[in-house]
A protein has these predicted regions:
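Solvent-exposed beta-strand/loop surfaces of large extracellular or lumenal domains
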Residues: 69-95, 310-329, 348-354
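Extended, loop-rich substrate-binding clefts of extracytoplasmic carbohydrate-active enzymes
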Residues: 212-283
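Bacterial Sec-dependent N-terminal signal peptides
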Residues: 1-41
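Beta-strand-rich recognition/accessory modules
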Residues: 87-101, 344-416
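Alpha-mannosidase-like glycoside hydrolase catalytic domains involved in N-glycan trimming
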Residues: 37-142, 149, 153-158, 165
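A short, structured loop/turn motif at beta-sheet edges
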Residues: 102, 106, 252-258, 282, ...
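Acidic (Asp/Glu-rich), glycine- and aromatic
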Residues: 274, 285-318
């Protein structure tokens, strides 16, 4: 008994010490978990009397520190999301998801951010591609020298032919666009019959076999025009190319699965550098255009607009929305192509509009500018080939009016 009494105080003391250590370890583990995991409660509201689908919600992650993975739920349903590194510094800057809402609905979402792990994988609903030809590949739509970025010096003799399909291309289920890698930086269009992704299979060069299977193809001849909303300079009388430049870059910022982001970077043009960013969301036929300058450009005027498709009819609300509907050959190869009918549209916020120029034989032009170092606008189009789209100028112009009044002017409201 004496021996037991001798050791008891020591055992008791060691037991207390162990409990303190264990408690400290548990608290440290809890604190570590709390730091590694953050929860955001978000409410997304549809302000309109019509249901809305695939409405973009973008969360700035700057104040949340290191984020490597995210999980979004509404109730028990997991919602696909996407993390993007916008400035390409290997840290995610934005979280994006798409909301489906009934008329006037307010829907709650729970966002959990994780400091470890990797982004969750979801089915791709957009696609982007930048590549050079592989001399060993004979099929025109199976080239596989994929790039993420390419820069040409300003004195590059022929950047247009460096890249396969002549520039970066991207798509949602409803559209497909390529941007020429030259001084025009024009947007050329791919028309679809079915609502799906196709450019990975066709690479903008659809074979006869693919056409027989219902794949789409190039539907617009653009020449030196704006095509669909190319950003240009303005010399006081007419649009000018973004040229000469010190260098010209095309790069893909994000491949999806919910939005793809591509950028055109022009350095050393008229003493400014500019970045033209195109954002394509899944489920959308419209594309967001943001132009960023390296300094305020209040003293500069620029231009954009849409091509005057041969024989086209025009619509304008004279407040930034302009559209056309017309038919023309998309290529001089009349054996493998047919005349294509398209509807085009552009919508520019009124604060950027300096003038709306009268239509000429080539295009419908806006003169634009900004008091700071950023401006933005939206572009949109349809093909008459679509089984899911519009098939007359009246249908298309009515759609454009509704698109502006709802999607453009009344985006969903996000609170968190």
């Amino acid at each position: 008994m004496m021996k037991f009494k001798y050791f008891c105080p020591q055992l008791k003391q060691k037991s207390k010490k162990m409990r303190r250590i264990l408690s400290f370890v548990m608290m440290a583990a809890f604190a570590s978990t709390a730091m590694a995991q953050q929860t955001i409660h978000i409410t997304v509201e549809n302000p309109t009397n019509a249901p809305r689908t695939d409405q973009p919600v973008v969360i700035d992650l700057t104040k949340y520190g290191q984020v490597q993975s995210a999980l979004i739920k509404t109730g028990d349903e997991e919602i696909p999301c996407q993390l993007d590194d916008m400035d390409q510094d290997d840290n995610f800057d934005e979280l994006c998801f798409l909301a489906d809402l009934k008329a006037k609905e307010k829907k709650p979402y729970t966002v959990t951010l994780y400091a470890e792990g990797s982004p969750r994988q979801y089915p791709a609903r957009v696609y982007a591609e930048l590549l050079v030809r592989n001399s060993k590949v004979k099929e025109k739509n199976k080239h596989n020298n994929f790039l993420e970025s390419i820069t040409a010096r300003g004195d590059c003799a022929d950047p247009y032919h460096i890249l396969h399909h002549h520039g970066v291309e991207f798509e949602s289920e409803l559209n497909g666009i390529r941007i020429y890698f030259d001084k025009r930086q024009t947007l050329d269009l791919y028309g679809k019959f079915q609502k799906r992704l196709e450019l990975q299979e066709t690479q903008f060069y659809t074979t006869k076999e693919q056409k027989a299977e219902g794949y789409g193809d190039d539907v617009l001849w653009v020449g030196n025009t704006f095509g669909l909303g190319a950003f240009r300079g303005w010399d006081g009388q007419q649009p000018t190319m973004i040229d000469p430049v010190r260098s010209r870059t095309q790069r893909i910022i994000s491949y999806g699965p919910l939005r793809t982001i591509v950028e055109i970077i022009d350095r050393g043009w008229q003493k400014i550098n500019l970045t033209i960013r195109y954002t394509q969301y899944a489920g959308h036929r419209d594309t967001d255009v943001d132009v960023y300058f390296n300094k305020p450009v209040a003293d500069y005027h620029f231009s954009t607009g849409i091509i005057n498709v041969k024989g086209s009819s025009e619509y304008s609300d004279h407040q930034g929305l302009r559209g056309c509907w017309g038919t023309d050959w998309p290529s001089s190869d009349h054996e493998n192509f047919k005349p294509e009918t398209v509807g085009l549209g552009i919508c520019i916020p009124s604060q950027y509009i300096k003038s709306e120029e009268p239509a000429n034989k080539d295009q419908y032009t806006f003169v634009i500018g900004t008091s700071d170092n950023h401006l933005n606008y939206k572009i949109i189009y349809c093909s008459d080939n679509e089984s899911f789209g519009y098939h007359s100028d009246k249908e298309w112009f009515d759609f454009l009016k509704n698109w502006k009044q709802t999607d453009v002017l009344l985006p969903v409201k996000v609170n968190y």
